[in-house]
Regions:
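Conserved beta-strand-loop surface patch within small alpha/beta domains used
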Residues: 1-128, 137-219
């Protein structure tokens, strides 16, 4: 574990508020998990750019014997019309100097310092929105140690945790509900942003595409 004296610095969180924005639902495909309702979620909605998704999956697949992980970087917004919070993950920062094994990943002090330096140097003006790590051959869930990391280093209501199972190609986000609770097994899908008319890059086979019924359609 890591000392509480060193936390991932994400800005002045006490005074931080999401900037107004327009949720880009029409520019994205919504992927649902078995725990998701087809109706719009009430809590935080997660959008991910193609480049961030590809790089995250590439890092996850780089070691199928040990857990790897890092930070999710991007913007935190609130839809001006619906007042619903959402985040756009634009990049990932693979963590260096970690201690890892087949069933554990620990961020060291050097890991946290490097993540903060990389955030400031490479992505000024962006936030650390959460973290990701892999569970090779173990499934998509948050272990007791994962929950400890999330609660101590990603305590804000808008922080998310992404777990990827690279062997079976599965993945899912863990998002706190409006009361601040987090279910370590009930993961959610995400909104995959599409760019330049290109199709989906999704490789996680445990998620299904949302079926959108146009207004006035018969379904």
């Amino acid at each position: 574990m890591i000392s509480d004296s060193l936390r991932i610095r994400i800005g002045d969180s006490d005074a931080m508020q999401p900037a107004p924005g327009h949720m880009p639902v029409r520019q994205a495909i919504r992927w649902l998990s078995a725990y998701d309702s087809p109706s719009p979620a009430e809590g935080m909605r997660v959008f991910m750019t193609p480049s961030a998704y590809v790089r995250c999956c590439a890092h996850a697949g780089s070691d199928l014997m040990h857990e790897v992980g890092g930070a999710l970087v991007g913007r935190w917004r609130m839809d001006a019309a619906t007042r619903q919070p959402y985040q756009v993950i634009e990049a990932v920062l693979p963590a260096r100097h970690t201690r890892h094994g087949p069933a554990h990943l620990t961020f060291t002090q050097d890991s946290l310092v490097a993540l903060n330096e990389d955030l400031e140097d490479r992505f000024p003006g962006r936030l650390m929105l959460g973290w990701y790590h892999t569970h090779p051959r173990m499934g998509v869930f948050l272990s007791g140690q994962d929950l400890w990391i999330h609660e101590h280093f990603f305590p804000e209501p808008w922080h998310v945790a992404l777990v990827i199972e690279p062997v079976t190609r599965a993945g899912g986000f863990f998002v706190r509900d409006t009361a601040g609770r987090l279910d370590p097994h009930a993961y959610t899908g995400f909104h995959e942003l599409l760019r330049d008319g290109r199709g989906s890059l999704r490789v996680w086979t445990n998620l299904r595409q949302e079926v959108v019924v146009e207004e006035g359609g018969t379904g």
